[in-house]
């Protein structure tokens, strides 16, 4: 089975939702993005965001966490049904990354992926390159994150 057969271009798949707690935001930021508006709730009040908010990289990591979890379940489902899952990976990269709104402590972000196109990779026979649009939306329906990514697929 090919990815485009499983999820045709234009069809959006919700991969999961993630609650961003103050504790998680601080722990991630202390390790990877130690800026006061990510690590100190009191200091964060005096910055442009007006409160503690997640690092953009944390929101991206949340997307990856939800995608990996979703794909593991989908892969297992297909195998259980006797269907050979698409052979995906690695990703050559991403582009157009935008952090559109801050993600605050207490926000729940719902992540999704939409296949835009799947085409043969001319330099590698038997390989497709899939382009996807990805996003995260908060509980108010506001898009907080979006980017495009590519993933290889093999025969």
What are these regions (language model features)?
Residues 40, 61-80, 98-108, 112, ...:
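Short, Lys/Arg-enriched charge-dense amphipathic segments
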Residues 1-92:
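Hot-dog-fold acyl-thioester-processing enzymes
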Residues 1-14, 99-155:
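HotDog/MaoC-like acyl-thioester-processing domains
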Residues 90-95, 111:
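Short beta-strand or tight-loop elements
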């Amino acid at each position: 089975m090919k990815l485009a057969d499983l999820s045709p271009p234009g069809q959006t798949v919700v991969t999961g939702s993630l609650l961003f707690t103050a504790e998680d935001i601080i722990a991630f930021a202390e390790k990877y993005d130690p800026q006061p508006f990510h690590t100190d709730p009191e200091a964060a009040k005096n910055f442009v965001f007006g409160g503690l908010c997640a690092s953009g990289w944390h929101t991206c990591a949340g997307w990856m966490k939800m995608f990996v979890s979703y794909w593991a379940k989908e892969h297992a489902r297909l195998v259980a049904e006797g269907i050979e899952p698409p052979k995906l990976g690695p990703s050559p990269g991403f582009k157009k990354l935008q952090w559109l709104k801050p993600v605050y402590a207490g926000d729940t972000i719902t992540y999704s992926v939409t296949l835009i196109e799947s085409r043969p990779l001319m330099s590698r026979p038997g390989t497709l390159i899939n382009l996807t649009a990805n996003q995260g939306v908060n509980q108010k329906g506001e898009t907080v994150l979006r980017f495009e990514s590519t993933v290889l697929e093999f025969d």
